[in-house]
């Protein structure tokens, strides 16, 4: 699911590990991820996806404008999931619904799947629309959640890429910020009020590296 970068970065090492044991073909849908997969993608679909806004929420108008339900239904029919023994989906709706349509066993392996688990803490007030999406966006025969606490046997820690594990971190004098739902300008305006603090911002909306006062900005590219 190319709505954001998390789905893509999680998939890289998982796919490489799976390929040690079985044949794996890759399908992506959506087009709002800056991180690129380091291997061939067999199927590239539009799917259904939301778009990041710049004021702390989803860009609703663009999400409505750029999604086409009829195209989505056609993609479900065209993706040949019937040729596969299993479908694994990280909150990717085309393969999930195609597998259901073709009676192919499917596994949901995602952060969103964790939200279906009774042991995962929930907010006191849950939007009915949000709950409807979580429950029905990507149907599956089995759900395994990626969560930051090992609360039961169906929850797993999110995978960390090998390239990240091999880095040698240092204790710098700055704080790291990643807020993809906000514009770079809005983040800068807020952080620059803390004049004696250094900030490193990774931004979905930046196209090059630059510094502005006590804030250094880096684009997302890997």
Task: Specify the residue positions occupied by each region the protein language model found.
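Conserved nucleotide-sugar phosphate-binding/catalytic loop shared by glycosyltransferases and other
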Residues: 2, 24-71
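Short amphipathic alpha-helix
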Residues: 7-18
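An aromatic- and histidine-rich active-site surface loop
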Residues: 11, 87-102
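Donor-nucleotide binding loops and adjacent catalytic segments primarily
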Residues: 15-17, 157, 161-164, 168-222
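Short internal beta-strands
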Residues: 24-31, 146, 199-204
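Short loop/helix-cap segments at secondary-structure boundaries that form the rim of catalytic
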Residues: 32-39, 96-101, 137, 147-155, ...
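Conserved nucleotide-sugar donor-binding subdomain of glycosyltransferases
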Residues: 57-86, 93-94
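Active-site-proximal region of nucleotide-activated glycan assembly enzymes
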Residues: 105-156
């Amino acid at each position: 699911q190319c709505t954001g970068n998390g789905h893509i970065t999680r998939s890289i090492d998982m796919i490489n590990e799976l390929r040690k044991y079985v044949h794996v073909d890759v399908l992506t849908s959506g087009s709002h991820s800056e991180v690129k997969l380091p291997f061939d993608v067999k199927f590239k679909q539009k799917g259904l996806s939301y778009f990041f806004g710049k004021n702390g929420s989803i860009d609703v108008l663009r999400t409505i404008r750029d999604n086409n339900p009829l195209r989505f239904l056609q993609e479900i029919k065209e993706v040949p999931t019937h040729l596969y023994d299993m479908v694994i989906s990280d909150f990717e709706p085309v393969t999930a619904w195609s597998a259901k349509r073709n009676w192919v066993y499917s596994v949901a392996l995602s952060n969103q799947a964790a939200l279906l688990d009774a042991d995962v803490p929930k907010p006191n007030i849950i939007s009915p629309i949000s709950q409807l999406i979580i429950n029905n966006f990507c149907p599956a025969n089995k759900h395994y959640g990626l969560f930051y606490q090992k609360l039961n046997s169906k929850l797993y820690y999110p995978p960390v890429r090998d390239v990240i594990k091999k880095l040698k971190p240092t204790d710098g004098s700055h704080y790291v910020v990643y807020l993809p739902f906000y514009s770079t300008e809005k983040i800068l305006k807020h952080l620059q009020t803390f004049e004696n603090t250094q900030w490193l911002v990774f931004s979905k909306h930046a196209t090059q590296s630059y510094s502005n006062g006590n804030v250094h900005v880096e684009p997302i590219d890997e």
